[in-house]
From Swiss-Prot:
Example GO molecular function: ribonuclease P activity
Domain of life from the UniProt record: Bacteria
Keywords for the protein's UniProt record, in alphabetical order: Endonuclease, Hydrolase, Nuclease, tRNA processing
Reactions catalysed according to its record: Endonucleolytic cleavage of RNA, removing 5'-extranucleotides from tRNA precursor
GO biological process terms, semicolon-separated: tRNA 5'-leader removal
The protein, known as: RNA-free ribonuclease P
InterPro entries according to UniProt: PIN-like_dom_sf, RNA_free_RNase_P
Record-linked Pfam families: PIN_5 (PF08745)
Enzyme class: hydrolase
Function noted in UniProt: RNA-free RNase P that catalyzes the removal of the 5'-leader sequence from pre-tRNA to produce the mature 5'-terminus.
EC number: 3.1.26.5
Presence of keyword tRNA processing: yes
Protein family according to the UniProt entry: Belongs to the HARP family.
Amino acid sequence: MRKFVLDTSIFTNPDVSQQFGDDDSSVFSGFLSLASKAEALFYMPLSAYKELKLIKGTAFFSSDFEFIVHIRSPRKFNLLIPGSVLYDFIDEIRKRIDHGLRIAEEHLKLAGPDGGTPIPFDQLVNRLRNRYREALRQGILDSREDVDVILLAYELEAVLVTADEGMKKWADKMGIEILNASYLKDCLKNLIKPEGTGEPVS
């Protein structure tokens, strides 16, 4: 039986969640309806589950969700991570820090020695924040929740389901199978077999 580790982006990214419904209630009920019939096991780390409940509120969660989606943290102390992944991560962080410094220097020059830039100061600060955030966070693991999701998929030899490009990138480095979250509904349908047949639901 196939195993899937779910990232919060399935339910929080509107471009992804709309495959299951038009609002939060129909999204969760639509997912659970298919997942409960699929011949598969579903997992989500506790940290990611807490984050999801914080974002969406507790109203959409019930015993049904926790019955279908196993809430379980990775066994961090037992996992052996390839050293090459750690070296790649350090190199990536170093490059991003250098890039962030260049962005900061660029905006300092725009401000000028006397703050005489034609760009209003608050706009300049906002632009600096946005570019700095993009340089340091986009396409990288930037939270404990992201790391927990990847480590759990690695430990269980499961399929990682996410829309996050940074998670996809680092999961690929670790040899984790990846499913684009936008394809999850179709995948679940293929894993549902009608009673008495061996064929998936069309």
